[in-house]
Amino acid sequence: MIKKENRSRLIIGSLIIFFGISIFISKYMYQYFLNKEDEEKIEQFFIKEEVKDQEIVEEIETTEEEIIIKNNYNYENYIAVLEIPKINLKRGIYDKSSNLNNVNKNITILKDSIMPSGDNASHIFLASHSGYGYTAFLKNINKLNVDDSIFFYYQNIKYIYKVSSIYEIEKTGSMSVSFTDGSDLTLITCIYGTNKQLVYVASLINQENY
């Protein structure tokens, strides 16, 4: 009887360990494939930014394999890419009207954002989670200081920003945005475990073609 009980416990224990390992591996693989998809989208953004509505422009050189990938995969392309070298962040940005432009899925561009266009002043507002989890893209933003660089790639132009101010605000469920005379980019994230948000404002200092 005791042997049977010990054997049952051993089997149950083994199953618990097995399922625990399986869940861990599944979560790891899921995040791995999400990261791979993001890398592919970013690469595609820089290679084929002029492609609109998933149409292949003849002037852009591409391989037969890339054409197959383009035609067979039905996913939305990024409209821009955010890069913060100091915290090793490089993420794509979806259109404001996209269902994927969701803070629980990606870095979100707020509807009040004014995208760069010619000599007009632009104001880009981006929000993301910090803390823990796959979507905590700004988890290391506290390492960012005044004068650190932020890059924003949009319509074949690399916009170069420098962090100009950092401050905290109360989390109220809504964001009051303010527009300056110059062009800027604002990052907003919640401070984990508090009822506050951290705001980074970066001023545009230069732009160049890429």
Language-model features: locations:
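Solvent-exposed, non-transmembrane regions of membrane-associated and secreted proteins
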Residues: 4-210
